[in-house]
Amino acid sequence: MGSPGLRPTLLLPQVLLLLLALLHVPPSQGFPGSGDSPLEDDGVWSSHSLYKDTPWCSPIKVKYGDVYCRAPPGGYYKTALGTRCDIRCRKGYELHGSSQLVCQSNRRWSDKVICKQKRCPTLTMPANGGFKCVDGAYFNSRCEYYCSPGYTLKGERTVTCMDNKAWSGRPASCVDMEPPRIKCPSVKERIAEPNKLTVRVSWETPEGRDTADGILTDVILRGLPPGSNFPEGDHKIEYTVYDRAENKGTCKFRVKVRVRRCGKLNAPENGYMKCSSDGDNYGATCEFSCIGGYELQGSPARVCQSNLAWSGTEPSCAAMNVNVGVRTAAALLDQFYEKRRLLIVSTPTARNLLYRLQLGMLQQAQCGLDLRHITVVELVGVFPTLIGRIRAKIMPPALALQLRLLLRIPLYSFSMVLVDKHGMDKERYVSLVTPMALFNLIDTFPLRKEEMILQAEMGQSCNT
């Protein structure tokens, strides 16, 4: 046993250490914390191995993270000097700072850490649209795209910020897929005016409207434009408009034009019919005439009336009945006025060679004579044995003589006189004339040209 005076001196350090351990008073200046600032490394194991079984640093708490600590060998507390702690952030959060902390001799952890919520890149605002997010661009935030009126969303409507700091799906866009709107007028029905086959129809040009940006690039019309004269029938009008996205809108309507009509008329047998306008529409007029050798009976003209009935009576063409019992040559000629042309053949005797040859040529050209409305009148002999003949009818000698005197036809020689439908002396012949030469002359007459047109329409010719 030693000196009693030395025992207090030997026990004093042990007592102080025990007291410090019980009161948690650090041996050096400093303050506890969870890593407010890094100080020194953990190379104090040997010099501070004395404190490895003593709580030293403050417990680590990481919001939105988990802490996994390992005490030094032989240690008991996970906040003892030299303890190493691994920091892991929860899903959707990322670590800022060191992933491993060490409890240092200054009672501080080697670094300060924090788990921050992960953030995705800011979404691009779609043109002509936008988006709304639940929690901005942070993890698990859901954003929903929307488009302005007239635009359609293309792509995924909803995206979510994922753990890899990327958005689910591709960014959406707003495209103009809605066609422009255009409204056409209603069906228009019109009735043609008298003697007309068309109706002037007008309407306001329809205006298109684009539901997106309101801009239209083209307006195309198919059909007659407004203000046109529409013929009889059913006409389809179509307007098409395009917007800048090349979407098209279409509207259609119809224009109906009706022509009021009477029943169709036919030309009388052995006659002609010439009608105005379309021949049977309200207001149309049809005129009738007969071929040479026939006389018109009934109405010379008929009109399609508002009650859709024809005026007058139905015409007909009757064979011309020449009256040779009239007293004067003028009265005889009046029967042919505007109806027939006359070719008067005069000879002092039936034995005249020119007369016989000429009559033979005319008989062979009877079709051409009929086509040109020519009646042959024969004056044969010298008064009082003079006779006149119109085909099968014989005129009295006195009437035949008057005709010679009226037209100044020589009494004692062969001659011919061509008289037109107006009683005019057109040509005289003192020798033979071929039917072709005669026909060529007559075909130059103005009235004959109109006849030729009608005959062509009716298909009348000497070739048929």
Curated annotation (Swiss-Prot):
GO terms for cellular component: autophagosome; endoplasmic reticulum. Normal cells and cells transformed by human papillomavirus type 16 E6E7 and polyomavirus large T. Suppressed in cells transformed by oncogenes such as V-SRC, V-ABL, V-FPS, V-MOS, V-SIS, V-K-RAS, and polyomavirus middle T. GO terms for biological process: autophagy; negative regulation of cell proliferation involved in contact inhibition; phagolysosome assembly; positive regulation of extrinsic apoptotic signaling pathway in absence of ligand; response to endoplasmic reticulum stress. Glycans are attached at residue 34. Residues 1-28 form the signal peptide. The keyword Repeat applies. Keywords: Disulfide bond, Glycoprotein, Proteoglycan, Repeat, Signal, Sushi. PROSITE patterns: HYR, SUSHI. Residues 177-259 form the HYR domain. This is Sushi repeat-containing protein SRPX. It comes from Rattus norvegicus (Rat). The lineage of its organism: Eukaryota, Metazoa, Chordata, Craniata, Vertebrata.
